Regions:
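Carboxylate-rich, polar loop motifs that coordinate divalent cations or form catalytic acidic clusters
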Residues: 1-425
C-alpha cells in the first residue's frame, strides 16, 4: 500500500544519505536542521525514522531532511507541549510521545498527534511530566512521570491507570530479562520491583544522582550516577557495587547504552563518550573527528546505534553528531561535516582540477573555492562590486592547454580567471 511504499522510500533515502557520507561525522545543529540543541533523546522507529526529542520541539529525520513538530495553540492535533523528554514505540507500532504535560501518540497516516492520555477512573487528562516508557514482557506498557502508570491504547485513545506502588515520581524505567523492573530515582537511588511485587531500594543518597539503567548481553545490570560514576549489580550480594574506572575516576554518568556487543557506551555530563569493555573491564575514550567543539568535554545525553550501524550522539547545547559506520570511497566535504567545512553551504555546480593539483569548485551564489590536493581550503573568490569580479553563480569551470582557467557564468557570460587575484578578463 501507499504507506508501505513510503516507508520503503524513506529507508532507501536514509541509507543512501548515510552511505554518501563515508566515515566523516556529520553535525546537525539549530542553524538549519534542529528545533533546539537541548536534546533529551534520540530514537529510531521501525520504519527507520530518527526521532530527536528536545526541550523545544520534536524532530524527525527521514534521511534527507528534518521535520519539526511543535505545539500550535489553535490545532488540537499538534504536539501538546514543546518540551519533549522521550519517544517510544511499542511492539504494535504505536509511537508514544512523552511531554512535559502528558502522553500523546503520533499517527503516521495523518501526521497528527492524539489528545493527551486520560485517567481511566476519572476521565480527566493525566497532567504529568513524562520521563520514560517501557513495554514489559507481559505486554503491559508502563509510564513514569509524576506517578507510575500503566497505559492502554484502543482506537487511538490513550488511558492510564496508576500502579499501586510506594514510589513517587520515578525517573528512567527498565525491565531486565528476569522481569525485574528497575526505577531510577535520582538522589534517592534506584528501586527494584521483583516479579512478585517485592520493592527494594538500592544505593543510598551518598551515591549521587542515579539517572540511567541498562542490561548487557550477559544479563548484568548497570546504573549510572551523575556524581559517583558507574555501578554493577552483584547478584550474590544483591547490591550494587562501584566499577573502578581507574584513571577516569568518578565519571558523571548521564546515559548508558548497551546495544553494542561486549561494550558499554557511557554518555557523560562534560567528559564526552567513554567505552567500558565488558570482557576486559578496560575503559577508553571514544574519539571522533570534530572541529567544532571539544568532544572530550561534551555533555552526551543520549546515544543510539541505528539499524545500519551508524552511531548518533546527542550533544547537549551543541546538536546531534552522526558517525557513519560504513566505509566507502566517498568523503563528504561541506557545511554539515564536523571535519572539513571549506566550501560554504551553497549548491555545487562545477569542478575542475588544474595542472597544479588544485581543485576549483564553482557554486550557485557563492563564487569559486580552491582546495589543495589534501582538500584543505586554499582560496575563496566571491562576487564583489569590482567590474572584473568573479560571478556569484559559476556554471562551468575549464582549464585549457595553456593552463588558463575559464569560467562560464549563469547570466554574466564567460571569462578567464586570474588564479591569484580572483579577477576575470
Amino acid at each position: 500500500d501507499l504507506l508501505t511504499m513510503r516507508n520503503v522510500l524513506t529507508f532507501l533515502l536514509l541509507l543512501f544519505s548515510l552511505l554518501c557520507n563515508g566515515q566523516s561525522p556529520k553535525l546537525f545543529t539549530t542553524d538549519k536542521e534542529l528545533s533546539s540543541s537541548l536534546i533529551n533523546q534520540i530514537y529510531q522507529d521501525r520504519n527507520g525514522f530518527i526521532w530527536i526529542a528536545t526541550e523545544d520541539g520534536l524532530n524527525r529525520y527521514d534521511g534527507a531532511k528534518f521535520t519539526i513538530y511543535k505545539h500550535e495553540p489553535n490545532n488540537e492535533h499538534s504536539l501538546a507541549h514543546n518540551f519533549v523528554r522521550t519517544v517510544f514505540e511499542d511492539s504494535k507500532g504505536h509511537l508514544l510521545i512523552g511531554t512535559y504535560i502528558g502522553i500523546q501518540m503520533y499517527d503516521p497516516a495523518t501526521d497528527n498527534f492524539t489528545p493527551l492520555a486520560k485517567l481511566e477512573d476519572t476521565g480527566e487528562t493525566l497532567e504529568s511530566n513524562i520521563n520514560s516508557f517501557i513495554e514489559r514482557k507481559n505486554g503491559e506498557i508502563w509510564v513514569s512521570g509524576n506517578v507510575l502508570c500503566k497505559l492502554d491504547i484502543k482506537d487511538h485513545l490513550l488511558t492510564v491507570r496508576k500502579v499501586d506502588i510506594a514510589v513517587t515520581s520515578p525517573g528512567s524505567l527498565f525491565e531486565d530479562k528476569k522481569q525485574n523492573v528497575w526505577m531510577a530515582k535520582g538522589e534517592e537511588g534506584v528501586y527494584q520491583l521483583t516479579p512478585d511485587n517485592q520493592l527494594t531500594l538500592h544505593l543510598s543518597k551518598d551515591n549521587g544522582y542515579v539517572k540511567s539503567i541498562c542490561e548487557d548481553q550477559r544479563g548484568n545490570i548497570y546504573v549510572g550516577s551523575i556524581r559517583k560514576g558507574l555501578f554493577i549489580y552483584d547478584k550474590e550480594r544483591k547490591t550494587f557495587v562501584p566499577i573502578d574506572l581507574k584513571e577516569k575516576g568518578e565519571l558523571p554518568v548521564c546515559f548508558l547504552y548497551s546495544g553494542i556487543p561486549n561494550e558499554l557506551y557511557i554518555g557523560t555530563d562534560g567528559k564526552g563518550v567513554v567505552i567500558y569493555n565488558i570482557r576486559t573491564h578496560e575503559i577508553s575514550e571514544y574519539k571522533f573527528d570534530n572541529n567544532y567543539f571539544d568532544s572530550g568535554n561534551s555533555k552526551i545525553h543520549s546515544i543510539l546505534k541505528d539499524n545500519s550501524g551508524n552511531l548518533w550522539l546527542a550533544v547537549y547545547q551543541k546538536g546531534v553528531i552522526l558517525i557513519p559506520a560504513r566505509t566507502n570511497s566517498f568523503k563528504y566535504i561541506g557545511h554539515k561535516s564536523t571535519d572539513k567545512n571549506c566550501i560554504g553551504s551553497c549548491c555545487i555546480t562545477s569542478f575542475c582540477k588544474d595542472n597544479n593539483g588544485t581543485l576549483w569548485v564553482g557554486t550557485d551564489n557563492d563564487g569559486i573555492y580552491a582546495l589543495t590536493e589534501k582538500l584543505e581550503p586554499a582560496k575563496h573568490f566571491s562576487h564583489t562590486t569590482h567590474p572584473h569580479s568573479v560571478p556569484s553563480t559559476v556554471i562551468k569551470l575549464y582549464e585549457d592547454s595553456e593552463h588558463n582557467m575559464w569560467i562560464g557564468s549563469f547570466i554574466n557570460g564567460m571569462g578567464k580567471l586570474n588564479k591569484q587575484t580572483g579577477l576575470c578578463d
